[in-house]
Amino acid sequence: MRAYDIVIIGGGPAGLAAAISAKKSGVDSVLILERDKELGGILNQCIHNGFGLHTFKEELTGPEYAGRFIDQAKELNIEYKLNTMVMDISPQKVVTAMNREEGLFEIQAKAVVLAMGCRERSRGALNIPGYRPAGIFSAGTAQRLVNIEGYMPGREVVILGSGDIGLIMARRMTFEGAKVKVVAELMPYSGGLKRNIVQCLDDYDI
């Protein structure tokens, strides 16, 4: 069983930042376990700009922002495993994981950092009624389909909710040639930033 000082579960921005910080602080062996096929996490599908202003003092897209962390991690020779799913963490900090190359394996860690990121609520948790789910997507799923998979989920779009991701997807779908019929909001005000309301809705007459 291989041993590491720190095992970080999740290779998104939080996991990468934790690994870089640990390595710069003098920790000898750091390992990142990422279930996706590349590092970067949710940032890989966020191709709009607005990232990096505080950390790098410049405006970057999500993939550019992730790339800065990935470059630093590689410069520091931080180990990582992709397409790897963590199955269990024991009280003794033994991490059980699996991937196609190694099968099921165990890693002994002195410390474990959980940096798995967040997930959207499911269709059921969102209380979307009906029994025909075809054509109904969460904003994050639609974003991944368009920006990463290259799949257009629809040509006539109604967006429920005016949070930032909904506003950004209204603009993105418009860029791809879809007709965004309406962005519907239950509250009397938008949940998104004023900047996104102007740049994503007003500028495109949505």
What do the PLM-derived regions correspond to, one by one?
Residues M1-I206:
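Residues forming the flavin
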